[in-house]
Amino acid sequence: MSASRFIKCVTVGDGAVGKTCMLISYTSNTFPTDYVPTVFDNFSANVVVDGNTVNLGLWDTAGQEDYNRLRPLSYRGADVFLLAFSLISKASYENVSKKWIPELKHYAPGVPIILVGTKLDLRDDKQFFVDHPGAVPITTAQGEELRKQIGAPYYIECSSKTQLNVKGVFDAAIKVVLQPPKAKKKKKAQRGACSIL
């Protein structure tokens, strides 16, 4: 077996969309029931991918505006971002392109982004929408459209509570780092070359 490769994976997105729960669900197979806003936290997990051991460094960030100046400090050296929004929060969905993409392009240009829709278990929960009349569910088609708009290689919906697709989120993050998608070659206009010295 080869030496382990370190991959730094940073979660970003609005506060309370479920970033920390997704990390805890992935690393410990449990679901925390209390909401405690994250300041910054790190997790580490050894994962075997195609016979290679990967040390996946998971960096959790705070989405609240109070941390706008501090949060980008965790972006340095990132190999991949998990950009999360809640499937039951239109505001968090809209902030992907309004807030998070501009921030990531400014502080970490060129780093791949996996778009993640969280709280999948609540999207089809009729009682949730009765109890929260202002909540608007985000469809899979809307998520795919946003993925195309921001140029993310993957869009994955998951539920940390039921663990549905949680592993898939992190598998995609590892895959995009180990096997980056081929960049489309830009066609250069064929013209006669002329140099003036």
Swiss-Prot record:
Lineage: Eukaryota, Viridiplantae, Streptophyta, Embryophyta, Tracheophyta
Binding of GTP, residues: 13-20, 60-64, 118-121
Modified residues (Cysteine methyl ester): 194
Membrane topology label: Peripheral membrane protein
Keywords, ordered alphabetically: Cytoplasm, GTP-binding, Lipoprotein, Membrane, Methylation, Nucleotide-binding, Prenylation
Listed SUPFAM superfamilies: P-loop containing nucleoside triphosphate hydrolases
CDD domains per record: Rop_like
Cellular localization per UniProt: Cytoplasm; Membrane
One of the GO biological process terms: cortical cytoskeleton organization
Renumbered ranges of motif Effector region: 35-43
UniProt record similarity statement: Belongs to the small GTPase superfamily. Rho family.
Species annotation: Oryza sativa subsp. japonica
Residues of the propeptide: 195-197
Lipidated positions per record (S-geranylgeranyl cysteine): 194
Descriptive protein name: Rac-like GTP-binding protein 6
Function: Inactive GDP-bound Rho GTPases reside in the cytosol, are found in a complex with Rho GDP-dissociation inhibitors (Rho GDIs), and are released from the GDI protein in order to translocate to membranes upon activation.
Name of the gene: RAC6
Classification via NCBIfam families: small_GTP
UniProt cross-references to Pfam families, sorted A to Z: Ras
